[in-house]
């Protein structure tokens, strides 16, 4: 039993990151952000973190007198444990009361994620057609808010032209979009015989910022940790949102000193080798794969499951982020949730209490490293805000994991000067004011600019 625990701890210690190392990470990330901001002024300059400026509408609770569209469609191309697109109709009234109707449309087969962009968009548009038929909206031409969890560059104000710069999170379409994402999706919708009005493309972190700002006027940072990770913050002068796209941090070798052999194995097998290094060390999609690799090695060393391995343990991405959050949140003496994941997901027969404890230990080591690295990044952003702020947090890591937000907040406070005060606050999607901000963006798009 001692040998089993020792073997697991030897693996777990590989994921430890000291405070001194986190300070180095923060300094290097700050330098990378400076380079990204400089790149906006000097397009030829090199930068791993893009730090794109995005002009957004006033990030404060909108007034009833603001021009808005009373009804619009929302389309969220998401991953999050199930490959799907989420369609929603949103109806507003003057009192910010919201009525919604939602459906999810599967993105199977998974070859859609690695084929041609046109095929992916045609599949999404066919789901939109089914949704429109169900609610008799095929010919209505409602405005559309299109949310993407990928790096998106806005040429000007939110609601203007937007370009998809890179596929991430397991997507790896063979071709790239030649121009405006909104225009390309309108073409796909037309092929599906669905009429849509003005289309605005939103980044997931910017959407989180809007949700937070609708509730708290001091919201100046949005942090998302899901199958990917990103952060945006309001610029010093309050006129733009800086979309960091910090998942790419480390592509220049800045994180090489922290990479374990499991990180390197995962990177080589991924859809985008040598890209999105920070994201691969912190996001739910990749954390679970690191857990699987580590557990497979420990079991192969006869230190878990009596040395038995299963086909599920050898299957890439067999463990989903939701399983990791379930395991981490299990505090029962019987390890009931851990045991369920081991038996139903990894096909382990009759796992012992020690197996459950060691599995949870490995999960905790990898999750803690993620939280610490995210905290290092957050500390960099907080130093740039300069006064007390609310940080709105979103994504499955914060929503589902019982302690992830606490770990991030605690470590960020250690790494940030004491005079920098901040509050972490989860997104409240039950309010109508956030939808009103999106509706205000859609209303700002000229009707004649239907291709946007």
Regions found by a protein language model. Give the residues of each.
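Short, glycine/charge-rich beta-strand/loop segments that flank catalytic centers
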Residues: 48-51, 142-150, 200-207
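ATP-binding/phosphotransfer module of carbohydrate and carboxylate kinases, centering on a glycine-rich
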Residues: 1-142, 214-215, 264-452
């Amino acid at each position: 039993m001692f040998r089993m625990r020792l073997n697991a701890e030897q693996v777990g210690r590989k994921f430890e990151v000291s405070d001194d190392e986190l300070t180095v990470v923060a300094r290097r990330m700050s330098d990378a952000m400076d380079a990204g901001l400089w790149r906006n002024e000097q397009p030829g300059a090199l930068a791993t973190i893009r730090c794109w400026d995005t002009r957004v509408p006033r990030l404060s609770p909108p007034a009833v007198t603001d021009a808005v569209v009373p009804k619009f469609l929302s389309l969220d191309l998401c991953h999050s444990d199930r490959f799907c697109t989420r369609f929603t109709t949103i109806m507003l009234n003057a009192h910010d009361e919201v009525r919604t109707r939602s459906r999810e449309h599967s993105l199977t087969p998974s070859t859609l994620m690695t084929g041609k962009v046109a095929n992916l968009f045609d599949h999404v548009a066919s789901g939109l057609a089914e949704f429109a038929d169900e609610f008799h909206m095929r010919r209505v031409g409602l405005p559309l808010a299109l949310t993407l969890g990928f790096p998106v560059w806005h040429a000007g104000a939110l609601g203007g032209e937007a370009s998809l710069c890179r596929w991430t999170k397991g997507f790896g379409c063979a071709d790239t979009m030649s121009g405006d994402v909104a225009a390309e999706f309108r073409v796909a919708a037309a092929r599906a015989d669905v009429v849509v009005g003005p289309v605005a493309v939103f980044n997931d972190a910017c959407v989180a910022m809007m949700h937070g700002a609708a509730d708290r006027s001091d919201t100046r940072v949005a942090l998302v940790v899901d199958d990917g990770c990103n952060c945006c913050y309001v610029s010093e002068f309050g006129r733009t949102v800086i979309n960091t796209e910090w998942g790419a941090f480390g592509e220049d070798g800045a994180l090489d000193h922290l990479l374990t052999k499991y990180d390197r194995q995962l990177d080589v097998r991924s859809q985008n080798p040598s890209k999105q290094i920070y994201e691969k060390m912190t996001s739910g999609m990749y954390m679970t794969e690191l857990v699987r690799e580590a557990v497979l090695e420990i079991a192969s060393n006869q230190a878990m499951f009596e040395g038995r391995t299963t086909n599920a343990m050898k299957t890439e991405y067999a463990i989903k982020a939701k399983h990791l959050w379930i395991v981490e949140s299990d505090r029962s003496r019987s390890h009931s949730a851990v045991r369920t994941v081991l038996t139903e997901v990894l096909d382990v027969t009759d796992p012992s209490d020690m197996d459950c404890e060691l599995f949870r230990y490995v999960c905790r080591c990898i999750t803690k490293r993620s939280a610490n690295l995210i905290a290092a990044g957050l500390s960099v952003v907080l130093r740039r805000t300069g006064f007390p702020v609310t940080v709105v947090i979103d994504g499955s890591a914060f929503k589902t994991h019982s302690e992830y937000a606490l770990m991030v907040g605690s470590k960020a406070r250690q790494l940030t000067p004491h005079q920098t005060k901040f509050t972490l606050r989860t997104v409240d999607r039950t309010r109508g004011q956030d939808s009103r901000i999106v509706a205000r963006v859609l209303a700002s798009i000229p009707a004649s600019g239907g291709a946007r």
